[in-house]
Structure formats: C-alpha cells, structure tokens
Amino acid sequence: MSPSRFAEITSRYPQLRIAVVGDFCLDRYLEIDPARAEVSIETGLPVHNVTRVRSQPGAAGTIVNNLVALGVGEIVPVGFCGEDGEGWELRRALRGLRGVTLEHFIQTTERSTFTYTKPLIVECDAIPRELNRLDIKNWTPTPAPLRARLADHVRALATAVDAIVVMDQVSIDETGVVTAPVLAMLGEIAAENPGLPILADSRRGLRDFPAVTFKMNANELATLTGAVSADPAAAAAGLARERMKPVIVTLAERGVLGALPSGETVSVPVLPVRGEIDVVGAGDAVTANAAAALAVGASLGEALVIANAAASIVIHQLGTTGTASVAEIGRILN
C-alpha cells in the first residue's frame, strides 16, 4: 500500500461513527512487587503486595480502545454493566476515552459487571508475569426485558453509524449482550442496509449469527465449516460464497486471510517479530482496524494490510492489551 493511499484511507477516520455491540468487561491489573512479599501471620500463607492497580475496558472495550487509538470520530458502545464497583470503574474508563458516548450503554442491577482481574508479577527489567486470573461473570440468562432493550438500542443505531462491530465474549450462551433478540435485529439491519459493514467475532463460534462479515481464527473456521485442511483459503472462500458476505481469518504466524463472496481471496503475510511478544489483543486489533478501513471504503485487501500491521504492533506491547495508532501503523507500512 502506498503512503498516499494509506493517508487517504486513515484521514477519513475522524468523520466516522462506529457502534460496538457486545460484552464489555473491566480489565483490572494488580501489579505485584515480589521484593515486598510477606507471610500472613494469621494463615502462614504467602502475601502478594500490590503496589499499583490499573484498569481499562476489555473484551468489546478492547475494540473501543483500538478505535480510539485510530482517531475514529465517535464510538458508541452498546452493552451493559452492573450497579457495582466494577461497573463504576468501567463506565469511568469508557467516559475517559476520546469520542466515546454512553447513551446506549446500560447500567443495571440485574447483571454483574464482567471483570478480568489479572495479578502481574512485576520486576525491574523483566517481562511481567501473569498469575492465575480472577473472573467475575454472569451465570444466568440475561433477563428478557434487558435483551429487548439491547436489541432496541441496536435498531436505533442502524442508520446512524458507518459500521457496527459485534464482540460476543461470554462463554455461556444467552448470558451476555449478544443474545437471540440482538442477533435477530442484526440480521434485519444487515438485510436492510447491505452496504453497512457489520463485523462479528464470537468466542462461542459464529454458527448462529446472521449474514454479516465473519472474523475468526483458523480453528474457529475449521469448526464452523468442518473443513479441517491445510488450505484455510478454500474453506474461507466457500463460507463467503455461502453467506454472501466477506470472511476474515487470522492465521497467527501466517498472517491474515480474507475471502469475498465472489470466491476471491487475499492473503497478507505476517510482519517480522522483534523479541518477546504477547498475542492477547491481536485479534481485536484486526477486527477494529478492518472495520474502520471498510467503513471509509477501503477494499478488503487494503483493510487487511492495515489490520495486519496493527496486530504486529499490538503483540509487542507486553503486560497489557495494546492498541496501535495511525502514526504507528504508517511507520510499519512505510
């Protein structure tokens, strides 16, 4: 991609309005100094002393973080949090992000705030080491009135945004934001607005999703299509033809692959790796960057070149779920 074409695409990002529909969580990092370790007088067990606490939006919030880093003009989260301390922290973190508006983000006593608490051993000149994670999640189905409210919020944004990103993060069916009513509404919107980019990613798989652009990894592609082969391009092309929507597949060390309903495929090789890496957040960087580029009219191939470069930046950011700015991506590509 030429520098002028990259500039042409990314210069339009400030005019975009993108909705992010899905499971927002609080990523809370507890930085532990091992030099301050103690032993509990009461129990005799080791005590980890936390010297710093930092939080940021995670899951669907990671998509938001990436869109903010790209300079997207307005980002509209559609989701929920609880009436709890974690929910207060999550809303504060989202409000503090440039361009994020919360009129479609619901706070409710009927749900707990989805939370990842990540203890990190932090030593001077060493890579942070994560201990066992502590999660807070919802184990019961999302109440029907809340599901209906969320679907209504999605409907309200259908003709008011330039793209929709759907992030289904929860592992238990119907306990999060992306429930049957929301999926049905997304299907209606996709049918009524064929030119609107709608990108979807799901931890539980995309089998029950309507005809929108699918983003997945190679294992998820194999599970969905039943095509366990060394040629993911053929499987992706078949899926794109069947669904009549583009398909995006991340291939780890092999880069990223895209397929169009015509059967045409594009493959973008991975960029060189420099030192230690952490792949957490790389897939979300691909999703966010592809959505922004497609929303301003980039081709699928152009969108994936940008998205692949963003992922190559994010994997080098250790001890956090990283992002990539337009300037950083431009330096990688040029």
Regions found by a protein language model. Give the residues of each.
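Active-site metal-binding loops of divalent metal-dependent hydrolases
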Residues: 24, 169, 285
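A glycine-rich beta-to-alpha transition motif near the start of alpha/beta enzyme domains, typified by
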Residues: 81-98
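A glycine-rich helix N-cap at a beta->alpha junction
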Residues: 93-110
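Conserved phosphate-binding/catalytic loop of the ribokinase/pfkB sugar-kinase fold
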Residues: 105-158
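Conserved phosphate/ATP/ADP-binding segment of small-molecule kinases
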Residues: 171-265, 269
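Conserved post-catalytic alpha-helical subdomain immediately downstream of the catalytic base
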Residues: 242, 271-332
